[in-house]
Regions:
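Long, low-complexity, Lys/Arg-enriched
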Residues: 1-171
Length: 171
């Protein structure tokens, strides 16, 4: 059942929040096991996060979908690089930003593999859409509301696909 998998994903992603609340003691043993057993910073945890992103998008919660997607992209890229997704998070985000900035320089862009180019475009788009949403359009050249909702929905799906891809699958 998709809703059950999405609830499991929510439990995994929200572990720090869930564990800090007394409600965990009253939660079903099944929910408690989801929180205890899955590591959101693992490939299995990322597959659950991809499901959560899709569920949020399907319910029209595109801001939340984009937020989870952006964080999960950082985690997945850290794992792909063999880095610690928690300890090296800031450095990995900086690297993603550097890749996205490289799109502006033709010489840098020419050195990108197709996979790196797609990742740089995904990160750049996620960052721009997130900024448009979180800054309530108070930016130069913000997207229109209708276009922003469409873009956020499309990006959420692209990010979910990238996050959940197989290890041996290209970016």
């Amino acid at each position: 059942m998709p809703e059950e998998r999405a609830l499991r994903a929510w439990a995994v992603v929200s572990r720090p929040l869930v564990l800090s609340r007394p409600v965990v003691g009253r939660a079903s043993p099944r929910l408690q096991s989801w929180v205890a057993d899955d590591n959101p910073l693992s490939l299995d945890g990322l597959h659950l996060q991809a499901e959560l992103i899709r569920l949020l998008r399907d319910y029209g919660l595109v801001q939340q979908a984009v937020t989870v997607a952006r964080e999960a992209v950082v985690t997945r890229y850290a794992l792909d690089l063999g880095r610690d997704p928690l300890q090296d998070r800031e450095a990995v985000e900086h690297e993603l930003g550097r890749l996205a900035s490289g799109l502006q320089d033709q010489a840098v862009r020419a050195g990108y593999t197709s996979e790196t180019h797609r990742l740089a475009e995904l990160w750049n788009a996620l960052t721009n859409v997130r900024n448009d949403i979180n800054h309530a359009g108070m930016r130069s050249h913000p997207e229109t509301t209708a276009n922003l909702h469409r873009l956020a929905s499309e990006l959420a799906e692209k990010a979910a696909n990238w996050i959940a891809r197989n290890v041996d699958q290209p970016e």
